[in-house]
Amino acid sequence: MSKNIKTPTNQKVLTNVAVVRMKKTGKRFEIACYKNKVVNWRNKSEKDIDEVLQTHTVFSNVSKGQLSKKEELIAAFGIEDQLEICKIILDKGDLQVSEKERQAASDQSLKEVSQLIASMVVNPETKRPVPPSVIDKALQEMHFSLKPNRSSKQQALDAIPKLRETLKIERAKMKIRVAIPTKEAKSVHTKLKTLFSDVEVDDWQDGSLEMVGLIEPGSFRALDDLVRNETKGHGRLEILSLKDVVEGELQIS
């Protein structure tokens, strides 16, 4: 005679989940989410709670399917509405990540930083790009530590000075064209030249000024402010190239 095996009423087994955990009043509360959706919810790229939560249920242990008791929820959160409690845990709880998942995420983040750095730098001697794989290897060898509270761009900028200790790299320069009307041209000319690292065109025509050259990326804001303020909006600043490079990657063995 066959027998039906039933899951106890205080258990609900889920699989392939991302668990978010919160501890309050000495008790553990967990929610079951779809993988990769917790981060999307927290950065507001996902606004549909049902795309994030697998169930509007609070657990004491997701992996064992054990549900939290009503009295424990009220004692910890002051409410018994499980959806509202799920939202609190989703916003403020700790996302549980396995060591394998953590390592995979770290590797991916490091790769993103390496690609960003590769888009920002060149070899100072050849002016050629440096392959992301070379940068990635150098970051790993120096045990560069990623910081979860900083963006990939911030971490790329943090890493560049350290990479200079082992790699021949420098920030790639921007190519800029500036046009200044006759009235302000003479008074602005000297100030402009101090912001260019290399001037390719310094042309006067009917009293107006045109300059083309290379600047450090960090000088762009100062140059933009100078042109805007000194000419009261009549000057023109044009970006010809965000990264002045010789075509083709530099191969480093």
Curated annotation (Swiss-Prot):
PROSITE patterns: UPF0023. Belongs to the SDO1/SBDS family. InterPro entries: Ribosome_mat_SBDS_CS (IPR018023), Ribosome_mat_SBDS_N_sf (IPR036786), Sdo1/SBDS (IPR002140), Sdo1/SBDS-like (IPR039100), SDO1/SBDS_C (IPR046928), SDO1/SBDS_central (IPR018978), Sdo1/SBDS_central_sf (IPR037188), SDO1/SBDS_N (IPR019783). Keywords: Cytoplasm, Cytoskeleton, Nucleus, Ribosome biogenesis. The keyword Chaperone does not apply. Required for the assembly of mature ribosomes and ribosome biogenesis. Together with K10C3.5b/EFL1, triggers the GTP-dependent release of ribosome maturation factors from 60S pre-ribosomes in the cytoplasm, thereby activating ribosomes for translation competence by allowing 80S ribosome assembly. Required for normal levels of protein synthesis. May play a role in cellular stress resistance. May play a role in cellular response to DNA damage. May play a role in cell proliferation. It is found in: Cytoplasm; Nucleus, Nucleolus; Nucleus, Nucleoplasm; Cytoplasm, Cytoskeleton, Spindle. Associates with the 60S ribosomal subunit. SUPFAM superfamilies: FYSH domain, Hypothetical protein AF0491, middle domain. It comes from the Eukaryota. Its main location: cytoplasm. GO terms for biological process: cytosolic ribosome assembly. The keyword Cytoplasm applies. This is Ribosome maturation protein SBDS. GO terms for cellular component: cytoplasm; nucleolus; nucleoplasm; spindle.
